[in-house]
C-alpha cells in the first residue's frame, strides 16, 4: 500500500513539474498595454503587470515600442541580449523604414515586421519576425486590418509556444 502511495505522489510531482515548466509565469510590460499583450495574457492565462525590474527565466517581457520610454527601450535591449523571451510590438511605429530602424536597434537585425519575438530555443538565440501579410487562395494580398491582426496574434502565439517548449 505504501508503495502505491509513493507512486501516486511521484506522478503528482511529475505532473506539477510539467505544468510549471510549460507556463509563462508573468507577462511584464514596458510601454503600454495593447491588444497583443492582452492576447498573450489570455492565451497563457497570465496577468499582465508593469515591468517590476526583475524578469524570471519563464516570464515574457512585452515591449510596446510606440509608447516605451528611452529607459524602457534600454531595459528591453538588455533582456534581449541576455536571452529572455521578449515580444517587441512595432505595430504603432509607422512605416517599414522606422520599423527596420527600431528592430535593428533592439535585436541587431533590421526587420520591417510589426512584431518581433526574441528568445532562446534549443540553446540558440532566435529572432522571429511576425508578419501581417494576409493573402487569398491565389496568393493575392488582402487589405483587411482585422484579418492581419488575427494573423499576427496566431503567429505570435505559435512563436511563444516554441520558446515555452524550451522549458526556460
Swiss-Prot record:
Keywords: Cytolysis, Hemolysis, Transport. The keyword Transport applies. The keyword Transport applies. It comes from the Bacteria. One of its GO terms (biological process) is killing of cells of another organism. This is Cytolysin secretion protein. It comes from Vibrio vulnificus (strain CMCP6).
Amino acid at each position: 500500500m505504501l508503495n502505491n502511495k509513493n507512486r501516486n505522489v511521484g506522478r503528482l510531482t511529475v505532473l506539477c513539474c510539467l505544468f510549471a515548466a510549460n507556463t509563462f509565469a508573468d507577462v511584464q510590460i514596458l510601454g503600454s498595454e495593447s491588444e497583443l499583450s492582452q492576447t498573450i495574457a489570455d492565451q497563457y492565462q497570465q496577468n499582465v503587470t508593469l515591468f517590476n525590474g526583475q524578469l524570471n527565466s519563464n516570464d515574457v517581457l512585452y515591449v510596446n515600442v510606440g509608447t516605451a520610454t528611452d529607459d524602457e527601450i534600454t531595459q528591453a535591449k538588455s533582456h534581449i541580449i541576455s536571452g529572455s523571451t521578449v515580444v517587441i510590438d512595432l505595430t504603432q511605429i509607422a512605416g517599414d523604414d522606422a520599423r527596420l530602424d527600431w528592430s535593428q536597434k533592439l535585436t541587431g537585425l533590421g526587420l520591417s515586421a510589426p512584431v518581433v519575438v526574441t528568445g532562446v530555443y534549443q540553446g540558440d538565440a532566435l529572432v522571429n519576425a511576425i508578419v501581417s501579410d494576409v493573402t487569398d487562395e491565389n496568393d493575392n494580398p488582402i487589405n483587411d486590418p482585422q484579418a492581419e491582426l488575427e494573423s499576427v496574434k496566431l503567429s505570435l502565439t505559435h512563436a511563444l509556444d516554441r520558446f515555452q517548449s524550451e522549458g526556460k
